Amino acid sequence: MKKRLLSLTLAGLLAIGAFTGCGSSGSDTKDTKEAKSTQEDSKEEDTKAGDKGTITVAASATPHAEILEQAKKILADEGWDLEIKVFSDYVQPNLVVESGEFDANYFQHIPYLESFNKEQGTHLVNAGGIHYEPFGIYPGTKASLDELEDGDVIAVPNDTTNEARALLLLQDNGIITLKDGAGLEATVNDIAENPYNVEIQELAAESVARVADEVAYVVLNGNYALQAGFSVAKDALAYEKSDSEAAKT
């Protein structure tokens, strides 16, 4: 129960941080500014980081740990000490929460969480949604989807839900067609039509970007795209839309 409350606290304060980062309207009066200043001074006197306890969070480097570093300042004002540890894969962050070594993690979407629980027998729960990172198709040896040729190789993540997102994105762009109802559990076995005879190379999510100079295209999770120096807006040849099935999870 304590871990659940800590996780909910973190999720809530992350949301507060997002709103705070948008800036003020600039319409504060002198009185409201003075009132805010008084409240902040009182808060600083009454609350110190760690007074309420420590929250330990496992996260992927980009952008999750970066977001947490900003949230750390807000949490400190609320009396919490936030300890962040960066992991490079999608397995250990869940295992350290399951074992009780960490209070929470920040890196995954709900379908992956549910799939992990099912496959690993873990008991993790969603503490709250924070933000959405779209999957994207990024250039490898080909600079445009118009250059797609028969037999090209496309690298995708190999874990259940992220592979499905990659395949759904390829389908949305006319590269393959999946069996009806495959959805977020789709695998390469669900490819019904492959007009370009593309070869799907399945790799651990953290390894996909590393083969960009060896394959025609790579399909990347948002965080690994950022780590590889890709921008969804500038570099993605195609990406998940805000109303996609994955975006609703």
Residues covered by each model-derived region:
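Short helix-initiation/N-cap motifs at beta->coil->alpha
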Residues: I84-L95, G183-R210
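Alpha-to-beta junction loops
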Residues: E98-Q108, D152, I175, Y196-E199, ...
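Periplasmic-binding protein-like
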Residues: G129-P139, L226-T249
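Sec-dependent N-terminal signal peptides of Gram-positive bacterial secreted proteins and lipoproteins
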Residues: K2-S25
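A conserved helix-loop-strand patch within extracytoplasmic ligand-binding domains
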Residues: T47, A127-I176
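Short, well-ordered beta-strand elements
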Residues: G50-T62, W80-V86, V153-I154
